[in-house]
């Protein structure tokens, strides 16, 4: 993952000394069998390895002379440098990230997945313990007299808008036709594949598209051998980007005389039970998908679900969904740069309970209490021990310039209630004084409520943070025209002219395979 570098800014002074902190971790060996995948995260083994990094500095935003201090006479460059001060330090504090991730395991209760356990559906699950949640599962149109014909191992996932994603497993040979049926019935135009077909000599996803340019038929059968319907899948074009390990396939899907154009993005640079070495190819993938969405015709199909899968459809898939949701929030955020003074937009970016986080000897029990209380309040989770936790708005307003901080440590039950009002949200205020929520913990929690195991490993959770930090660096560089220090894992790929739409990447390093005559895909 590279390293995170920071400039310590304390007590009104700026130190020239740069500390480099390597936050990369050793990857644990996967624990899995032929029929199941381990849902226990790698966090236990990762914690001990990460703990060996020693005590990491936890400088907090309020100790910076720039934080929430619009009267401080600084040039724009210095204001921008201070804008991501807290986020960098939050990522550096491994013990905080570990506690966040641990609390995810405790904050989501058991889910009802009985549909996937039914006898006629078990053969359709790639892993016996990765099943779709009943209340969010994708239900296919039923075929008369065919039991289980509405079942596929997939869930609708709400993100920036309802049903932004369909998260699913890598198709099996006996579910490929159902996969294309799901694509058709939901009018999906984009498929994201975050795995190779095989990894470590194990099949992770069966090929559901033609291997060569041309067409292939996938039929849906009824109760007997009668054909319920036939989907024609034609591979039109393949674009290979070996540098970023991204393959783009343009596919035509035809059913009952109607044809739709589908784009599949396969990212091969993300190994199973692991993370990419750099965020740049992954972020480029996200921008390419955004571009493609904006080009979809008819425009009414631009907000249909994006189908996302890896092998099990939880780890890499959940990490992707988290990053996309955060990117949407960044789009909103950067629109404010033209309308609002930079320091007013950026300074409240990652408001934290400062005093609680300043100590290197952090009380994880107390921190856990804060996190749980925050989630109970923001998500309406019933917590019998916290009936008085209903006044988060007062704390939230502190991020708009106030230096108020919560108590350092709860000493009794009464103090617990006061401290628990602190809402650990990383947010900014837009020009209408509305909070833009950047709470990554909350995003992952909501994803897990819709499909268990999303963002499966601690390393993946940390990768989400690193992706957003690198994206902030890159966008500020492009937007403001000056270089920020300590920009890691960012290459000079195409600079986009605005924050919501990027230009198509150069194909200088790509290989395009297509017929001699090819009409433009819609």
Curated annotation (Swiss-Prot):
Tissue specificity comment: Expressed predominantly in anterior-like cells and to a lesser degree in prestalk cells.
Chain intervals with Low complexity compositional bias: 33-63, 382-410
Localization in the cell: Cytoplasm; Cell membrane
MF terms in GO: phosphatase activity; protein tyrosine phosphatase activity
Record-linked PROSITE patterns: TYR_PHOSPHATASE_1, TYR_PHOSPHATASE_2, TYR_PHOSPHATASE_PTP
EC identifiers of the protein: 3.1.3.48
GO BP of this protein: regulation of sorocarp development
Region ranges (PTPase insert (Asn-rich)): 327-426
Active site: 310
Reactions performed catalytically: O-phospho-L-tyrosyl-[protein] + H2O = L-tyrosyl-[protein] + phosphate
Domain of life: Eukaryota
Keywords: Cell membrane, Cytoplasm, Hydrolase, Membrane, Protein phosphatase
Free-text function comment from the UniProt entry: May have a role in growth and in the early stages of development. Affects the timing of development.
Protein's UniProt name: Tyrosine-protein phosphatase 1
């Amino acid at each position: 993952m590279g390293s995170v570098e920071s400039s310590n800014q304390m007590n009104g002074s700026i130190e020239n000394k740069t500390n480099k902190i390597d936050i990369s971790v050793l990857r644990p060996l996967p624990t899995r069998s032929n029929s199941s995948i381990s849902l226990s995260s790698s966090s236990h083994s990762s914690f001990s390895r990460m703990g060996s990094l020693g005590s990491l500095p936890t400088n907090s935003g309020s100790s910076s002379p720039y934080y929430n201090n619009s009267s401080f006479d600084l040039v724009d460059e210095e204001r921008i440098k201070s804008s991501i001060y807290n986020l960098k330090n939050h990522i550096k504090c491994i013990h905080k990230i570990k506690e966040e991730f641990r609390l995810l395991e405790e904050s989501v209760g058991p889910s009802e997945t009985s549909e996937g356990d039914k006898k006629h559906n078990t053969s359709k699950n790639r892993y016996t313990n990765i099943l779709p949640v009943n209340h969010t599962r994708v239900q296919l149109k039923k075929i008369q007299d065919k039991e289980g014909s509405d079942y596929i191992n997939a869930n609708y996932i709400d993100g920036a808008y309802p049903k932004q994603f369909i998260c699913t497993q890598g198709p099996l040979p006996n579910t490929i036709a159902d996969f294309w049926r799901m694509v058709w019935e939901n009018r999906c135009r984009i498929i994201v594949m975050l795995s190779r077909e095989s990894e470590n000599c194990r099949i992770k996803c069966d090929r559901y598209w033609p291997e060569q340019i041309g067409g292939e038929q996938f039929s849906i059968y009824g109760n007997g051998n009668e054909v319920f319907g036939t989907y024609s899948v034609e591979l039109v074009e393949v674009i290979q980007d070996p540098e970023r390990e991204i393959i783009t396939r343009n596919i035509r899907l035809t059913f009952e005389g109607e044809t739709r154009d589908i784009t599949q993005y396969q990212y091969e640079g993300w190994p199973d039970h692991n993370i990419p070495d750099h965020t740049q190819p992954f972020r480029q993938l996200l921008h390419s998908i955004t571009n493609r969405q904006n080009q979809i015709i008819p425009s009414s199909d631009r907000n249909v679900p994006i189908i996302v899968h890896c092998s099990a459809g939880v780890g890499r898939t959940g990490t992707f969904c988290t990053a996309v949701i955060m990117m949407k929030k960044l789009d909103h955020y950067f629109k404010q740069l033209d309308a609002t003074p930079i320091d007013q937009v950026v300074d409240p970016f990652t408001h934290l309970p400062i005093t609680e986080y300043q100590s290197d000897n952090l009380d994880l029990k107390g921190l856990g209490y804060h996190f749980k209380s925050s989630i109970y309040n923001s998500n309406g989770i019933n917590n019998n021990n916290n009936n008085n936790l209903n006044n988060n708005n007062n704390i939230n307003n502190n991020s708009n310039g106030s230096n108020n901080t919560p108590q350092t440590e709860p000493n009794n039950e009464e103090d617990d209630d006061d401290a628990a009002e602190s809402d650990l949200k990383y947010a900014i205020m837009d020009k209408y004084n509305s909070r833009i929520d950047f709470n990554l913990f909350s995003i992952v929690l909501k994803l897990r409520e819709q499909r268990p195991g999303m963002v499966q490993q601690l390393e993946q959770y940390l990768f989400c943070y690193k992706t957003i930090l690198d994206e902030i660096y890159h966008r500020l560089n492009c937007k403001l025209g000056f270089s920020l220090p300590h920009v890691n894992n960012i290459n000079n790929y195409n600079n986009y002219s605005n924050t919501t739409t990027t230009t198509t990447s150069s194909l200088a390093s790509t290989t395009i395979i297509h017929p001699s005559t090819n009409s433009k895909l819609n």
